A protein has these predicted regions:
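Helix-to-loop junctions at the C-terminal end of transmembrane segments
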Residues: 81-94, 181
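C-terminal transmembrane helical hairpin of 12-TM major facilitator-type secondary transporters
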Residues: 95-145
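A membrane-interface helix-boundary motif in multi-pass transporters
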Residues: 179-198
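Small-residue (Gly/Pro/Ala) motifs that create kinks and tight helix-helix packing interfaces
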Residues: 53, 85, 173-181
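Loop-to-transmembrane helix entry/capping segments in MFS-fold secondary transporters
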Residues: 64-65, 152-162
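Juxtamembrane intracellular "pre-TM" segments in multi-pass secondary transporters
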Residues: 2-33
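Extracytoplasmic gate region of multi-pass secondary transporters
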Residues: 28-79, 139, 143, 173-174
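MFS transmembrane alpha-helix packing/gate-lining sites
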Residues: 77-81, 165, 169
Length: 198
């Protein structure tokens, strides 16, 4: 219906898809920087959220009934912060700087979760809030950066390829996490349930 409406308005028809569009996109270095940031960023967040409640119980001694509350701060924060950071990007630009700040925050968060310090619930909460800032900051600058390096007629293909790369990461990283946990982090079995030493 939308295409018919656009045709009725007399707008130029879109150019048909061509295989050389893919070649153009995958030979663009900027595309690969954004695609790799996307796969690394989302692979460091989404699989982490899957294991975060168990991390809260095992490492930070959070009551299992409340263990999902701390990781639950992440999407709540994203609802509030992502539009604010998007507005900031629209006003000042500086997409590469914003993405770099968010990526450094993400590295800091995972480093703090990995170090054996301050194994208390309030520390985990603060670190999760910092992760919420990173989780909002990077995408609000990353997705609008794609049209700056890819022509409009190839944007659909570029976004599809970015999601294709991202899904490879989202498939592989949980397997890697599970392998690491089973190989190096197994604790004792308690009440018939395997525990892990984070």
């Amino acid at each position: 219906k939308l295409d018919a409406s656009l045709d009725a308005q007399g707008l130029e028809p879109e150019e048909p898809f061509r295989m050389k569009d893919i070649v153009y996109i995958v030979t663009n270095k900027g595309f690969w920087l954004i695609a790799l940031l996307c796969v690394l960023f989302y692979s460091a967040v989404f699989p982490f959220i899957k294991y975060a409640a168990d991390l809260m119980v095992q490492k930070y001694n959070v009551d299992p009934k409340l263990a999902g509350t701390i990781p639950g701060l992440l999407p709540i924060g994203a609802i509030i912060l992502t539009p604010l950071f998007g507005s900031l990007y629209d006003r000042i630009g500086k997409g590469a700087t914003l993405m770099t700040i968010g990526a450094v925050m993400l590295i800091f968060v995972h480093t703090m979760f990995a170090l054996p310090i301050l194994n208390v619930w309030w520390f985990a909460t603060i670190i999760m809030i910092v992760l919420g800032f990173a989780f909002s900051l990077v995408p609000s600058a990353m997705w609008p950066s794609v049209p700056k390096i890819i022509p409009e007629k190839q944007l659909g293909t570029a976004y599809a390829l970015i999601f294709w790369v991202q899904n490879w990461g989202l498939m592989g990283v949980p397997l890697l996490i599970g392998w690491v946990l089973n190989s190096y982090c197994k604790g004792p079995v308690v009440d018939g349930a395997q525990t892990y030493d984070y």
